[in-house]
Amino acid sequence: MKAQVLTLTGSVAHEIELPPVFSSEFRPDLIKKAVIAQQSRRYQPHGAYVYAGITASAVGWGSGRGVSHVPRLKNSSRAAKVPQAKGGREAHPPKVEKVLIRNINQKEKRKALNSAIAATISPELVRSRGHVFTGSLPYVLSGDFESLKKTKEVIAALRAVGVYGDVERAERSRKVRAGRGKLRGRRYKQRKSLLIVTGKERLRAARNLAGVDVCLVDNLNVELLAPGTHSARLTLWTEDAVRKLGGEQ
């Protein structure tokens, strides 16, 4: 399988042979399993205070009064301590000893990564994820792209190859998050757009574009290729990155 290598102006420079990994079987089940396993490494243990809800001075009345046998506050008939009482303990509070990490076999993880890479060259899968682009997949840019230093130069190159519309889609998607999260440092939600995979230089000029992630091919992982377990992210490869995927140095 071959792909066209594009210049910064969008013209075809030459063709390159794609590595066999781009022909891997599509396995959304393994991709989801691998992403969840990776996300679980960031979970933090949570636990309730041991004496929460049970510090009240309350005793049961015993039988013979025609009321339930729950602990009641002294000099009062108000129930306390039990889960169904106001201010009582929680029935099943979070435990710090709960195992949060989800593991995955190494072979499954490797196969999931290969499958996620292969999904990036399927126009049907990429469009079904909501991405906007013109032209054919995969997008492979010449090595000059990695040397860009200005964001406006990166934007011009993305416009030339026909993928900047997806960045604009991510810009329009920004909205205030519902719920308490907006008070906890995550006020806005925004869709993911382009993933740029480079071979040698991490393209810092693209880091402020809406929804764009940049990574070296050596650091590529399943979650970058399938955010939220949804595979087939619109991905832009540099020529050096493709050669490294094929085992070339």
Swiss-Prot record:
Keyword Hydrolase carried by entry: no
Keyword annotations: Ribonucleoprotein, Ribosomal protein, RNA-binding, rRNA-binding
GO BP term, pick one: translation
This protein's record includes keyword Ribosomal protein: yes
An example Gene Ontology molecular-function term: structural constituent of ribosome
SUPFAM superfamilies: Ribosomal protein L4
Assembly mode: Part of the 50S ribosomal subunit.
Role of this protein: One of the primary rRNA binding proteins, this protein initially binds near the 5'-end of the 23S rRNA. It is important during the early stages of 50S assembly. It makes multiple contacts with different domains of the 23S rRNA in the assembled 50S subunit and ribosome.
Name the record gives this protein: Large ribosomal subunit protein uL4
Species: Methanospirillum hungatei JF-1 (strain ATCC 27890 / DSM 864 / NBRC 100397 / JF-1)
Gene coding for it: rpl4
